[in-house]
C-alpha cells in the first residue's frame, strides 16, 4: 500500500466518523425540538384552561413532586385560594376542579425541567467525547443559557397574576411564548445546519429574504401571544370584516394611542389579522423571487410548500375566530404556527447550506 493510498483511507475514515457525529448531534437536536414543541402546546392548553396560576410558588427542585395525599392537596389548594383569580373568578371551586387545573401547570413545568436535562446531559457527553466541532460548542452553550432565561421569564410571567391581576400579564405572556419560539428556531436552525444538502446554497438575496420571513413569523407569534393574553380572539368574531367594517372605529380609544397596540383587545386582534396578511404577502413575494432566480430547484419548490402552509394556517385562524376560539381550534392554530415557523427555519437554513467542517 502506498503512502497516498493510506492517506486517502485515513481521510475517508475521519470523514465517516465526522458524518456519524454530525448525525448523532442532529438527532439529539431533533429530540430537543420535539419536546420543545410539546412544552409550547401544553403551555397553550394550560393557558386556555385557565390553569397557569394553579401553582403559586416557584420550586425548581422540590416542585418536581406533586401533592401525594389529601392533606398536601388541601395545602396546595389553600395557597391558590389566596390569589385574586380564585377570589374573583373561581370562588367556590372544588378540590377536584383545582386538581384538574393543577396537573396542566405541573406537566408544563415538568416538561420544561426535562428539556433542561435533555440538553445538558447529552451536551456534556458530546463535548467530552469531542463530537462537537468548531462553533457548535458555543451555540449549544448559548441554547442552554437561553433555556435558563426562559425558565426565569416563565416565573416572571406567572408572578404577574398572583397579586392584583386575575390572569397573567399579556406583555409577559407574549414574551414567554416568543422566547420559547426563538429557542425552537435556534435548535432547528442548528440541526438543519448539520444536514448534507445536494443543492448548492442560494444567492444572498434569497437567503436574506428567507431570514426576514422567519422574523415575520416570530413577530406574528408575538402578536398572537398578545391576542391570547387579552382574550382578544373573542372581540371580532366575523370575517373578512370586523363587525361590518374594514377598519373598526374603536381601535384607538385609549390614551396615549400606543397603549391600544398592547392593551386594547380590539386593536390587538386587528393588528394580528393585518400582520397575518403581511406574512402571506411576504411568502408569495419570496416564492416569486426564488422561482425567478433559481426556477425548478429544491429551493423554489420549498417556497410553494411554505405559501401553502401559511394559507392553511390562515384558514385555521379564521375558523378559530368564527367559532369564538374553542379549545381544540385554539390549540390547532398554535400548533400550526409552530409548523409554519419550523418549515420557514428549515427553508432559511437550506438556502445557506450546511455548516462547514
Curated annotation (Swiss-Prot):
Q: Which organism is it from?
A: Brucella anthropi (strain ATCC 49188 / DSM 6882 / CCUG 24695 / JCM 21032 / LMG 3331 / NBRC 15819 / NCTC 12168 / Alc 37)
Q: What does this protein do?
A: Catalyzes the conversion of heme O to heme A by two successive hydroxylations of the methyl group at C8. The first hydroxylation forms heme I, the second hydroxylation results in an unstable dihydroxymethyl group, which spontaneously dehydrates, resulting in the formyl group of heme A.
Statement: the UniProt record of this protein carries the keyword Transmembrane: yes
Show the taxonomic lineage.
Answer: Bacteria, Pseudomonadati, Pseudomonadota, Alphaproteobacteria, Hyphomicrobiales
Q: Name one GO cellular component term.
A: plasma membrane
Which InterPro entries has this protein been placed in? COX15/CtaA_fam (IPR003780), HemeA_Synthase_type2 (IPR023754)
Q: Which cofactor does it need?
A: heme b
Q: How does it sit in the membrane?
A: Multi-pass membrane protein
Can you name this protein? Heme A synthase
- Span-the-membrane segments of this chain are 24-44, 110-130, 140-160, 175-195, 209-229, 274-294, 303-323, 325-345
UniProt catalytic activity: Fe(II)-heme o + 2 A + H2O = Fe(II)-heme a + 2 AH2
